[in-house]
Amino acid sequence: MYLLDTNVISELRKGGDGQAAAVAWFSKVDAGEMFISALTLIELEIGILRVQQRDSDHGARQCIWFETQVCPEFEDRTLSVDAAIARRCAQLHVPDPKSDRDTLIAATALEHGLNIVT
């Protein structure tokens, strides 16, 4: 089973060369085996809000994509951060501190026995 990093979800929306590879991979994996972290929802929404400040039309399209595709698709497959994940995250920061969000996503994958897809 897999934990999809935020960039994988974003790539599907963007299109381009990376999208073809992502779509090909997605078509081979059962949807029930793909999960996201609640942090991915945070990162996507922050990105959309930033786009909306610069270009309201583009931001509105991204918001529709997020609300009608991402949220419903992963409604039952979004993993929250709990105490075990928080503690694993702390362990990943020592001796070399890293980004909190990335480390929480990695800790989520480790605690759930999932492979991270980036």
Predicted regions span which residues?
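Active-site neighborhoods of divalent-metal-dependent phosphate/nucleic-acid chemistry enzymes
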Residues: 46-51, 60, 64, 72-117
